[in-house]
Amino acid sequence: MAAPMEVVVCTDSAAPLWSCMVWELHSGANLLTYRGGQAGPRGLALLNGEYLLAAQQGKNYICAWELQRKDQLQQKIMCPGPVTCLTTAPNGLYVLAGIAESIYLWEVSTGNLLVILSRHYQDVSCLKFTGDGSHFVSAGKDCLVLAWSLCSVLQADPSRILAPRHVWSQHTLPITDLHCGFGGPMARVATASLDQTMKLWAISSGDLLLSVLFDMGITSVTMDLAEHYIFCGGSDGSIFQVDLCSRPGPREQSFQPEQNTGKVFKGHRNQVTCLSVSTDGSILLSGSHDESVRLWDVKSKQCVRTVPLKGPVTNAAITLAPPSMLNPEFRPSLPLPHFNKHLLGAEHGDEAQGGGLRLQLGLHLQGKEPSYLERLEQLQAALSGYLEKNMLGSQMLPVRVFELEEEVRSLRKINRDLFDFSTRIITRPSK
């Protein structure tokens, strides 16, 4: 069985003919191009291996393509404002988008907007799910990093303000990028900031594990799959490699390029906007505002390929090609629904909207039904009200009274028979 193909998915801010380009990692062969707009930074995501989502730069909608129908825009997902960052759950069930200082969470199967999280004070700049989808992390220009439990967010009382699991506030300038490692709730999160630091956090405990100070602002960050190294892109185009498996050191460190000459990648002429590592950890991908994507050999720190683009690179990542990307006959398992702009129940009450299911509880979970005596009392009350509201001289009144009295007698007999039957069953001697 052939090994899965690794591909590069990248976008820039000035491509006149295409929105996103996909090319094979090792050969550089162009495989696919998608047309329909310009994706903003941190605004590109694959959805369940079937759709490609791109948040349009400075616009209030997200473009969605089927992976194989690259020339036909499938849908425009309208949003309440310009989308600043975008991500999807690994299982394909949820979509997260940062809009201004709020986080919007959609359910993919129905298109319902489930929750709006408003705990940032300035624009949200980064969003990432953990590998198992149990948590997600948000970061913003307000220097805050928030770790959220997805289960807690979905089960929270809408009337209460949702609280993140952890609030990390040690950065002093806007956060530019973040990366979630593997491990689910035990994962580690790396964050990059213009305050010239990269920080490493533990989701399980909320502790700060490592802080590295550089001599420039850090604009991108990533880790290899084994989490042996952290790669940090600088504002001047340099890329720094931080070793996580060296001998134990202090929690707060300073990276000196002159003392770590073998751990610096040099070649870009402008700030590094995105970083990604191949599955075997041997190749580092970088995108920059110098309008180029570069591939680096991690061991030698040499650039092995440069791909020129038409504008500053906004997104670039290495990923395993989904089967649908290379199969022209593939079609999505489910069509992409219409995504709502308003919270579920906000516009049309609490009734389930189209695409939802109405669940009926079992008999043992349903509320107690009224007995025949209670129904009889209700009937007598209705009869009294009827007599009071209607004229006594009406010709139909005696007939209606007779009918109601007959119904009362019938209900009394039914209730008496049920009582006798229940008494016989309860008092029947056991064999």
Curated annotation (Swiss-Prot):
Pfam families: WD40, WD40_alt
Cellular-component GO terms for this entry: dynein axonemal particle; nuclear pre-replicative complex; nucleolus; rixosome complex
Gene3D superfamilies: YVTN repeat-like/Quinoprotein amine dehydrogenase
Compartment list: Nucleus, Nucleolus; Nucleus, Nucleoplasm; Cytoplasm; Dynein axonemal particle
Any single GO BP term: rRNA processing
UniProt keyword list: Cytoplasm, Developmental protein, Nucleus, Repeat, WD repeat
Organism domain of life: Eukaryota
PANTHER family in the cross-refs: WD REPEAT-CONTAINING PROTEIN 18, WD-REPEAT PROTEIN 18
Role description: Functions as a component of the Five Friends of Methylated CHTOP (5FMC) complex; the 5FMC complex is recruited to ZNF148 by methylated CHTOP, leading to desumoylation of ZNF148 and subsequent transactivation of ZNF148 target genes. Component of the PELP1 complex involved in the nucleolar steps of 28S rRNA maturation and the subsequent nucleoplasmic transit of the pre-60S ribosomal subunit. May play a role during development.
Protein name: WD repeat-containing protein 18
Name of the gene: Wdr18
